[in-house]
Amino acid sequence: CDYAEGEKIAVNLEERRERDVFFLEDSEELEIRNVTVRRGGGMGIVAQMCRNITVDGFHAEPNDGEPVSLTADVFHFIQCDGSLTIENSTLCSSLDDACNIHGNYMIAERADGREAAARYGHKDHDHAFYCRPGDVLDFIDPDTLAIVGHATLSDISFTDHEALHLRLSFKEKPNFPIRQGMLIENPKRMPEVTIRNNHWYNFPHVRLSGAGKTLVEKNNFHDCGCAVMAFDLAGYWLESGRMSELCIRENRFGPCRAACIIAGVSG
């Protein structure tokens, strides 16, 4: 990119994005209220495998004259369930998405009887389990994204030191062939989402996915890439969660570089 002489630019030296303001895991009944973040070298809130989350009055705004608040996503929720409410919050000038809600796909490698070997598709998914015994997993054709079958998980473990490869055990032998490359999704462990009465601007996107009901209402979005992107990312980040019910109402959309709303099956 070309920059004009005297133009202020931001240089991000925290590519690993490991300095999050809040990191939440395997927790329930969480409330984060009345927080202001002026500068952070990572994400604002990361929550994975959590249940029933309320974020009320979270403000990520840089000090006057500063170009950046957070160097990554402000909100990032992975395979959470129950309810997720984000309201009365002001977000601006983040270097990545204002909000990203998704699950994680695993990729099938092989299967034998009641067991299957799988791996995570991205190194940043390591050292975490995104399903629990008793969860019903969907197996998805990677070419058509059609659901091929289901299996109930009975056990899960890592098989390597990098914690990227997994052994999955099922309650019963799947009644369909598990092919190498199939995507494995945990669709039920996703939240019902409410994003209400927020002011978000100068950010790339809001990314929403998941089978739970999602309501986006009475927000002000402007000066962004795309205000609402509603689809999973099966082809790149391996982020799962095809939308089932999305309601967008009574919002104000200002200038968006791509579009105000983009919805689809997968991106």
Regions found by a protein language model. Name each.
Residues 1-18, 149-150, 156-193, 197, ...:
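Small/polar beta-strand repeat architecture
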Residues 19-20, 41-46, 63-73, 95-101, ...:
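Short glycine/acidic-rich loop motifs that flank beta-strands on beta-rich extracellular proteins
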Residues 82, 90, 94-106:
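Catalytic cores of secreted or luminal carbohydrate-active enzymes
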Residues 126-161:
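Ser/Thr/Gly-rich low-complexity blocks that favor extended beta-strand/coil architectures
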Residues 27-31, 49-54, 80-85, 191-194, ...:
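Short "repeat-start/strand-capping" segments in structured domains, especially the N-termini
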Residues 15-28, 42-50, 74-80, 186-189, ...:
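Extracellular beta-strand-rich solenoid/capping regions of secreted or surface-exposed proteins
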Residues 50-84, 111-126, 220-256:
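Long amphipathic alpha-helical scaffold regions
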